[in-house]
Amino acid sequence: MLTRRIIPCLDVKAGRVVKGVKFLNHRDAGDPVELAAAYNAAGADELVFYDITASSDERAIMVEVVERTAAEVFIPLTVGGGLRSVDDMYRMLRAGADKVSLNTAAVYNPQLIAEGARRFGSQCIVLSVDAKRVNAPGEPPRWEVFTHTGANPRPTGLDAIEWIKRGIDLGAGEICINSMDADGARTGYDLELLQAITAISPVPVIASGGVGSPHDMYRGIVEGGADAVLAASIFHFGDYSVADVKRYLAERGVAVRMI
């Protein structure tokens, strides 16, 4: 039976972990290295860092954060945010990341996915997609890809499912799908979106956006078909521990790595 992964997500801004609702109203959640070490000790299967700092002047801070984190944790670390070139990817991998996550830059330069996969291997390339439901009531479900998610998200006109298919064809080895409608709202994943993606993806899919309880993660796996489930708020602010989630899943027959 395939073991499902539990992944805490750390949004890093100017060297601190923050968390907002639908990308806004950020609350400070602590030091990234300290949080990463705590999640490592608590039994997390992987960690994701997203650098949401707007200023390129502060990008060096993220490299330092990754270096310090890699020295403290012994689980896979994915880093995304502001990676616009193969050199950017190399810099993060050299600092200690195991995988890099591409989002906005890949939309504007899809060949970046292929270039990264050729240089580092598909297993290193995660395509992260921020998707928003755009169908009118009564219409078949449809989601659009947005970039620059934050205070000023930009619609791309790209259909999320078609973009994910293309990203996989270009060499992405994993998909992280984030529902913009659910992000930070703690109402559960967009299961319809998740199902649409897992139905067409030959590579692992990570569910993101909307977790409020272990049951939401259970539904993401059992109903949505996710290979891994990502969460931020419920972990950062002490609502649930990684152990709480794994215990809940294991009691309901989901295979997880216990510590």
Swiss-Prot record:
GO BP terms in the entry: L-histidine biosynthetic process
Molecular-function annotations in GO: imidazoleglycerol-phosphate synthase activity; lyase activity
Protein name as it appears in the record: Imidazole glycerol phosphate synthase subunit HisF
Class of enzymatic activity (EC top level): lyase
Function: IGPS catalyzes the conversion of PRFAR and glutamine to IGP, AICAR and glutamate. The HisF subunit catalyzes the cyclization activity that produces IGP and AICAR from PRFAR using the ammonia provided by the HisH subunit.
Subunit structure: Heterodimer of HisH and HisF.
GO cellular component, one term: cytoplasm
Family: Belongs to the HisA/HisF family.
Origin species: Chloroflexus aurantiacus (strain ATCC 29366 / DSM 635 / J-10-fl)
